[in-house]
Every structure is written in structure tokens, then in C-alpha cells.
Regions:
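Short, acidic Ser/Thr/Gly-rich low-complexity loop/linker segments typical of extracellular
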Residues: 53-67
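Short, acidic, small-residue-rich periplasmic hinge/interaction motif at the N-terminus
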Residues: 34, 48, 83-87, 101-141, ...
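Outer-membrane beta-barrel signature, preferentially recognizing the C-terminal barrel domain
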Residues: 516-518, 528-577, 584, 602-614, ...
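Face-selective signature of the C-terminal outer-membrane beta-barrel domain
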Residues: 302-332, 354-497, 501-503, 513, ...
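N-terminal periplasmic accessory domains that precede
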Residues: 101-107, 121, 147-150, 166-169, ...
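A short, solvent-exposed loop/turn motif at the edges and junctions
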Residues: 52-55, 79-93
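Transmembrane beta-strands of outer-membrane beta-barrel pores
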Residues: 235-239, 254, 265-269, 325-331, ...
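Periplasmic plug
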Residues: 160-206
Length: 770
């Protein structure tokens, strides 16, 4: 304490002497010091100004809001050192200036010896009660070209970064929520993030009740700049066929405000081929029919664009407001489901068929978000989202024998959907490390569907859900726990159908840290699933001459019971993460095939049960810290599907691997993902065998990568249906996405005052309070 007072007094009197020694116009250097983990202001941090040859010029302490101000005669490659007891010292280079300068928020990283409520691993990961907090290293930030690329370099368990399909996904198809500063975001938003603006990444592998049904939540916490801005753009394309992704982002900062304009576009013009075999077993005694389709190349075309305008206003440690408007448009004149080919009935060529679907949609969205930090570690969050979607789809199926048209089906579906989402969240952190959170979320949706085949049929649907939850978590030594309960009120109305139901969602999480390197975690949760609007559409839709489908207005909500056991170990350059996930669904909604009036009808029903067991082990090696990471991911899948008139089981063993390496300005990334088969109802949906190999070169402003998709194995997807009435198998493949080369180019410019922060591993300047 005496040392701190002495240093403060020393800095104060030295500043007075150095400031008023001469009658010159002074330059003011201002900024704010925050905690990198919590984004809270740090009071009494020591800020020292040094000349280019490391001569001490002046020093001050930050105030209760983390702000500081230092006066000096000139700035010629001067730099700041910022330190505080229990934190790593930061160095901020100021460059040359004759005007007053304002640094970005200076985020200090806590040192491991001062952390009481978290477990710290060697790679800068802080294991808190409800999430892992990852502080990217300087090398990881420097070798990343965007927020997406940084996420890939972090190699977080279970996440698959699919830059071809523009998604961050799980192998099992579960929901991944992407957030930026707590606000729900999309792939394009993360693509627009500059790595240097990212303070930390928060990884929730067992999200709390506020996140709904998400299996993983990734939240990027960014710093706020007081001035200047940036422009960046990226192009990801195959120069030989129709594959292009493009993004653009413009940001401008002025004091507490930030203005941003971003855009993302995607274009596909590819060819796919399908071959299928199926049998029709007629219960009325007709001879069984064996049918084969030998497909030819069929085009798939898609144009997607999504511009976004954002304004945010914030003061760290007090409040944060953001308003964003997004417009999304997608036009697919040739759908992925299209197929054209010869038809063989009982091995005899009988003609040809052509299925052609096309769709387009447009969706404006307005998102308002407000966060207020109160006294005594309390936070209030308010969020309002309004969204409209107009969707148009046409389906055409034609089958010919020679010049004779045997089957001609054509129908259209036009829908207009209106959403309003209102949410309020309250959080309270206690001195003992405990945390209480509660929230109320209301979703109101209206959907109007116009179906037209021979006549126009209009269906109006109203659906509302109110969700109230509370959750409490606490750390007791090496033991962490979280307990919560959620209550949902679901209101569904369609014509004369009216249903109101209440469901409950209890949740329990237990975590035990055996040592700083070993942990185990167990989670159990219960939640309900409501029928989708599409599944309750009663209108008949013809598929071909033998099949049709329709929804079911008598569908009921069903419960899902999920248990997750996970454990992890990390020591030096090696880490292992094990996850065993069991999900049981009671009376789930699954399709059923019946024979009705001489045709086969697909209709959803509440079936008996569905079981899904998944085990996955992620082994990660880092023989050269921050330079070389190698990972192996073996796993097993087990399914049991129990319908009202069928039972099927399926087991799959799978194996994946990845490698990330960098040397100076060169980078190498390899991803080898085995197919993830998914079985539900009576159908096995084969996943994609996906490989991505790329090598690149990056400077501070420019980067270029060259790579290849699926260099070692041709791309294909298979499916099998085990129905007793209509067993089938199909195979989809494409030469366009097999051995597909691509290039990825990015360029960014920063303007205005820019400052570079460097974490100091060794501090020999002295007198900094550490």
C-alpha cells in the first residue's frame, strides 16, 4: 500500500515538473484501462510514458472509471506502459503526432496467480463457472485475417469452420449461436471482425437457459476505439467454376459512437448428379415396383446478398446500445434438390423425368439492444427484434415416356412471416463468485401461406411463445454448480384449431476441477420442442405420381431429456477433451409413410421415442507453441428410432483430424472431417466427407491464400430409407466440389489514430507497481 502511494505521488509530482518546465503547447494522451476478462474499468492502474529510447517522461494513475490523461511536449515514437498488480503489463506504441491522441481501450490480461474464481490453463484459457474465456495470443491475432480465421486458429473443441458453406457448425447439426459483445450475430458479422479488435472469445459448451436450445455459444468481445476507422474486404473464389464468397466492412469511430456498414455475398453455379434406387411395396396386392433413376448433370444456382448497417454507442463499465438493420435476399433459380435422368421400372427403361424446384426470399430485420451495468455488479439487458420474411417456392415434376407426358405436377407456395421478439435479462454477481440470472422472452409470429396446385388454398397461422427462466450458479472451492428452471407458454392458432400448453425446462450443471489441468463436468437438462409451422400445414403437396405429403394439425409438443458428461486434461503441449452426449426424445415428431388411396403418403406424427448417443474425444498437440497445432478427433454415434410401426438402429465410427501451422508471415491449414451420419425416422442421412487444405501469406494489410476442397477424396452424399413400404437409396456427387481449387484474398486499411498493444513478457523498466 505504501509503495503504491509513493509511486502515485512520484508520478504526480514528476508530471507537474515535466509539464510546466517550459512555456510550450502540450500534447494530451488519454485512454481507458479495462479488464480483458470482464471489460470492467481498472482503477489506480499505473500508466507511464516513455520516449523512443526508453527514457521516462511522465506517469499517472487511472481514475475510478479507468480513464487517464498524460501531458507531454511532443510525441516522437513514444510509448506507454500500463500495469496493475495481478495483471500482465501492456505496452502501447503511440507513433509520431503533434495533436492530442486517444488510445483504444487498453485491456489488461489477468495473471494466473491473482485469479481465485477461475482455473487457468497454459494456453491463455480461463475456465470460469459457466464458460471458457480464451485470450488470443499476439501470434494468433497477427496470423489471423478475420474473426472467422481466428476462430479456426483457436481450434476449439467440436466446432467446424465451414468457409465454403459460410457456417460455423457442429458435426451433429446442433445449433451454434454466434454473438458479438453478447448480441446474436451471423457468420458474415464475424467474418467482418478484425482480429486486432478482439479482446477475448467466450466459449460456452453447455450454454445456460438464456440461450435456448443452442449446444454451443461463441461470444466475441471486442474493444471500442475512440477515433479512426477501418475498411476491409475479402474475396473467396474458385476461378474455374461458379463459386464465390465476398465480404466488405467499413467502420468509423468517434468518441463513444461507432458506425458500421458491412455486406456479404455468395454465388453458386455448380453441377450435381444423383442416382437412386427404390421399391414400392403395395399392401393392396399389386406387384411390387422396382424403380431406378440414373441422373445426369443438373445445375444448382444461388445468389445471396446481405448488407447490414449498424450504430453503437457505449461506455465501458456503464452502458451499451446498438441498433442494426439487415437486409437478406436469396434467389435460387435452380435448387439443390433438382434432378434429371432416365427412369427404369423393373430394370426396363421406361422414360425420363425432371424435378425442378426454385425459390427466393427476402428478409429485412431490425435489432435493438441495450445493456446497462448497475451498482453492486448488476446488469440489465433489453433486446427487441422485428423481422419480416417473404418466401416464394415452385415445384415441378414431369415424367415422360418418349414424347408422351405421363406425369405433370406443378405447384407454388408463397408465404409471408412476421416476427416480433422481446427479451429482458437481469444478472447479479455476488462477492463470493455466485451469479443469479433471470429473463423473460416473448416471441410472436404470424404466418400466411398461399398454396396453389389446381386451386388456391390460404392458411393463416399464429404462434406465440413466452419463456420465463431463472438460473443460479456458484463456485465452492474446486466444485462448481448451476441450477435453473424455465417455464414456457406456447399458444398456437390455425383456423378453428387453438392450443395453449405449458412446458417446463429444469437444468443442472456440475463441474469439478481436480487440479488446474484436469476437470470433469456433468449436465442434465429437460426441454420441449414445438411443432414447426411447416409440419402443421394441412395442404396436400404432390411429389410425383406415386407420392404426396401433407402436414398434421394434431401434432403435440414433445420433451427432450439430455445428459452430457465431459472431461478434460491439459499439460504443456498436450490436451484431451472427452464428451459423451445422450439425448432421449419422448413422443418426438417424425415422418411416417402410409398407403392411402393407391398412393404413398408422408405425414408427421408423434412417434414412440428417439435415442441418440454420441462420444467424441479431441486430442490436441502443440509441439511448437502458437506455431504448430495438430488435432485428432475419434468418435462414435449410436441411434435408436422407435416409430409407431417401426424400430431401427444404426452405429457409426468416425475419425477427423486438423493441423494449423504458421511461420513468420506464412500459414498452413488442413482440415479433414469424416462424414457425420444422422439417422432419424426411417432414413439414414449420410454426411459429407470434407477436406480443406490451404496455404497463405499475410502482411499487416494484405493476405492471400490458395487452397483446395476435397483434394484427397471425391465429394458425395448418400442416404438410405429403411421403410417397409418404400425402401430406397440415393447417392449425390459432384465433380465441381471434388479437387476444387480456390484463392482467398483480403485487404484492410485502418485510418485515423491507431495504436498497437503488446503484452510484455519481461518488464525491466522498474517503478511500475508490479
Amino acid at each position: 500500500m505504501r509503495t503504491g502511494l509513493f509511486l502515485s505521488s512520484f508520478f504526480f509530482f514528476f508530471s507537474i515538473i515535466s509539464t510546466y518546465a517550459g512555456n510550450v503547447e502540450l500534447i494530451k494522451v488519454t485512454g481507458k484501462v479495462i479488464d480483458a476478462l470482464e471489460s470492467k474499468p481498472i482503477e489506480f492502474a499505473n500508466i507511464a510514458l516513455y520516449s523512443a529510447d526508453s527514457v521516462f517522461v511522465s506517469g499517472v494513475n487511472s481514475d475510478e472509471k479507468g480513464n487517464f490523461s498524460i501531458n507531454c511536449n511532443d510525441l516522437k515514437n513514444h510509448y506507454l506502459t500500463v500495469s496493475y498488480l495481478g495483471y500482465e503489463t501492456q505496452k502501447v506504441e503511440l507513433g509520431i503526432s503533434k495533436n492530442n491522441v486517444r488510445t483504444h481501450d487498453i485491456a489488461l490480461r489477468p495473471s494466473s496467480v491473482q485469479l481465485k474464481d477461475v482455473v487457468v490453463t497454459a494456453d491463455g484459457t480461463f475456465k470460469k463457472i459457466d464458460r471458457d474465456v480464451i485470450l488470443p495470443s499476439e501470434i494468433q491475432l497477427k496470423t489471423s485475417t478475420s474473426g472467422i480465421n481466428l476462430l479456426q486458429n483457436l481450434s476449439l473443441p467440436r466446432l467446424i469452420i465451414d468457409q465454403v458453406n459460410n457456417s460455423i457448425k457442429l458435426a451433429n447439426g446442433g445449433e451454434v449461436q454466434i454473438r458479438i459483445n453478447g448480441i446474436l450475430s451471423e457468420f458474415a458479422d464475424v467474418q467482418a471482425l478484425q482480429p486486432g479488435d478482439i479482446i477475448r472469445v467466450e466459449y460456452h459448451d453447455s450454454p445456460g437457459l438464456r440461450y435456448g436450445n443452442a449446444e454451443i455459444v461463441v461470444d466475441f468481445i471486442t474493444r471500442h476505439k475512440q477515433s479512426g476507422g477501418s475498411v476491409n474486404a475479402e474475396l473467396h473464389t474458385n476461378p474455374f467454376n461458379g463459386f464465390t464468397n465476398g465480404s466488405f466492412n467499413l467502420k468509423f469511430n468517434h468518441k463513444r459512437s461507432e458506425f458500421a456498414l458491412s455486406g456479404f455475398t455468395s454465388h453458386r453455379d455448380l453441377d450435381f448428379m444423383r442416382k437412386s434406387e427404390e421399391s414400392f411395396v403395395f399392401p393392396d396386392g399389386k406387384p411390387a415396383l422396382s424403380r431406378r433413376i440414373d441422373g445426369e448433370k443438373t445445375p444448382f444456382m444461388q445468389f445471396y446478398i446481405s448488407p447490414k448497417l449498424t450504430y453503437s454507442f457505449r461506455e465501458a463499465g456503464k452502458y451499451f446500445f446498438t441498433a442494426s438493420f439487415r437486409w437478406a435476399s436469396n434467389n435460387s433459380p435452380y435448387a439443390y434438390q433438382d434432378v434429371k435422368g432416365d427412369v427404369y421400372n423393373n430394370d426396363e427403361l421406361t422414360g425420363n423425368m425432371y424435378r425442378h424446384d426454385k425459390f427466393r426470399f427476402k428478409m429485412p430485420l431490425l435489432d435493438l439492444y441495450y445493456q446497462r451495468e448497475l451498482k453492486n455488479k448488476q446488469i440489465i439487458i433489453l433486446n427487441a427484434v422485428g423481422r419480416f420474411q417473404e418466401y416464394k417456392e415452385t415445384h415441378s415434376y414431369k415424367e415422360r415416356r418418349g414424347n408422351e407426358l405421363m406425369t405433370d405436377i406443378f405447384y407454388t407456395e408463397d408465404s409471408k412471416r412476421y416476427w416480433m421478439i422481446l427479451e429482458g435479462i437481469y444478472e447479479k454477481n455476488f462477492q463470493n463468485g455466485a451469479k443469479l440470472s433471470a429473463g423473460l422472452k416473448h416471441t410472436q409470429m404470424y404466418n400466411e401461406i398461399d398454396n396453389k396446385e389446381k386451386e388456391l388454398i390460404t392458411v393463416g397461422q399464429n404462434q406465440a411463445e413466452s419463456y420465463l427462466y431463472t438460473e443460479f450458479q456458484q463456485k465452492l472451492g474446486k466444485f462448481n454448480y448451476s441450477v435453473g428452471i424455465g417455464v414456457s407458454r406456447n399458444d398456437y392458432r390455425q383456423g378453428d384449431v387453438k392450443e395453449i400448453k405449458f412446458t417446463y425446462r429444469p437444468s443442472l450443471k456440475i463441474n469439478y476441477n481436480f487440479t488446474d489441468n484436469i476437470y470433469a463436468r456433468y449436465n442434465v437438462s429437460v426441454y420441449n420442442r414445438t411443432p414447426s409451422i411447416y409440419s402443421m400445414n394441412p395442404v396436400v403437396q404432390n411429389i410425383d405420381s406415386l407420392r404426396f405429403r401433407r402436414g398434421n394439425t394434431n401434432l403435440d409438443t414433445y420433451m427432450t431429456y439430455q445428459q452430457v458428461l465431459s472431461a478434460g486434461f491439459k499439460k504443456s503441449f498436450f490436451s484431451a477433451d472427452l464428451r459423451i452426449d445422450h439425448r432421449y426424445q419422448d413422443k418426438p415428431i417424425m415422418n411416417q409413410l402410409d398407403y392411402v388411396d393407391g398412393r404413398f403418403m408422408t405425414q408427421p406424427y408423434n412417434q414412440k421415442a428417439f435415442h441418440h448417443l454420441q462420444g467424441e474425444l479431441t486430442l490436441k498437440f502443440e509441439p511448437i507453441k502458437n506455431r504448430l497445432t495438430v488435432g485428432f478427433v475419434p468418435g462414435i454415434l449410436r441411434y435408436i428410432s422407435e416409430g409407431n410401426n417401426y424400430t431401427h438402429t444404426y452405429t457409426q465410427w468416425r475419425f477427423s483430424a486438423f493441423l494449423n501451422a504458421n511461420y513468420k508471415k506464412w500459414m498452413l491449414n488442413i482440415q479433414l472431417w469424416d462424414r457425420y451420419d444422422y439417422f432419424q425416422e426411417e432414413t439414414l442421412y449420410g454426411g459429407e466427407t470434407w477436406q480443406d487444405v490451404n496455404i497463405g501469406y499475410k502482411t499487416d494489410r494484405f493476405s492471400i491464400f490458395a487452397g483446395m476442397i476435397n483434394p484427397f477424396k471425391d465429394w458425395n452424399m448418400k442416404s438410405h430409407n429403411w421403410s417397409a413400404l418404400n425402401p430406397s437409396s440415393s447417392n449425390t456427387f459432384s465433380n465441381n466440389v471434388s479437387q476444387m481449387p480456390y484463392i482467398k484474398i483480403s485487404y484492410n486499411i485502418s485510418f485515423g489514430r491507431q495504436f498497437k498493444s503488446v503484452a510484455r513478457k519481461v518488464d525491466n523498466t522498474g517503478g511500475e507497481g508490479k
